[in-house]
């Protein structure tokens, strides 16, 4: 059973659902964090932090910041629409749904009741080639707003965040109905008129949007004529967790918002380290980013009130990192509570920083550790236990510390180096083509052994002889 497996969908069905849910969630933000994401990747959180923040505001020639209408920016709104359409989803308009509430020019739906009017949600459809509606996607947006109303809408959402944590009883649990009760009724009627059931609905969201996902799941038996009781719910970075098993709650362990509440209740740990495991959540996935790696940044307390920790919360980091887990050759070996370290370093930090399990601001990690590299040139260091390491694309350097590790190289994986390889380690080559006999690919160069598959290779540093035991070529 894979780490994101859901209900009885099986591995492939669960992976397809996860990919759909992620595409819908990312679309709900309309690429709002595009400028920060690109600026962070180029400049990082060290000496390049000022340039990263400028990029977040003003963007660049290859990104759009939060300030709209700058002539040198690309159209990230257009890119967001193209991405969700490429994933198979198309926005459904208010007129199509027979809905008369507030909608903006993009087709985004806004909250209905006073106190909820800054909430936003997207409704999308998936169609076959003949134009028949197959599925409906509902994507709740997190704390933010359209670029032109970002400040006022974000303030309204922050009020909702505070009320969810500290306000009236059941505020968070009832959030979806209070904000979008009428719209969700229209969507249910529209779906039913097209021969769909609640099982054909994907509900997704991030941050405050993830809270809305959990809320809707908890209300699905009693609201909207129970239409959504069998829908599929995937929440990212949600501070809350539904009481039942309807929701898959996905987040980074070092995201200060994820699991900030215990169910729907706040406590002192909500404002500090909160790493209590929950049955519905992934509890040990780490975004190994510049903040997590930095001793200096971590001299400050881990807290939802400490803004630098929020780099682990941004939707683009979820889209990239979680998708690499989804695509990993180790996917089926990872369980809901496996320790998974995902490389999300900036380009400057990646050149000098070893990706590893630092176990910061969390309960002690148990069992095997999975380390998933990026598409760049990573430095990856295994621990003392049996680690599963996948460098990904790029020319990676991997340091072996235990002699009981499994290294996975898939497809066109680049030119990697393994330091400290031992005969008790396992090398797995997947989708590389050619002979399955390692002797057809290995040769000694100087004091190293190089295993090559076309233009891709692994250099076992300091290894001058090799046994075929523990080498798998598929």
What are the residue ranges of the model-derived segments?
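A generic structural signal for beta-strand entry/edge sites
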Residues: 133-137, 424, 446-450
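Gly/Ala-rich beta-loop-alpha elbow adjacent to hydrolase catalytic centers
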Residues: 205-209, 213
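Acidic, glycine-rich calcium-binding repeat modules characteristic of RTX/beta-roll
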Residues: 370-372, 377-438
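Alpha/beta hydrolase fold serine-hydrolase catalytic domain that processes acyl esters and thioesters
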Residues: 2-62, 74-88, 94-200, 221-388, ...
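Short glycine-enriched nucleophile-adjacent loop
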Residues: 213-221
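Low-complexity acidic/polar repeat-biased segments
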Residues: 439-474
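A mature extracytoplasmic/lumenal domain signature
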Residues: 142-144, 207, 431-433
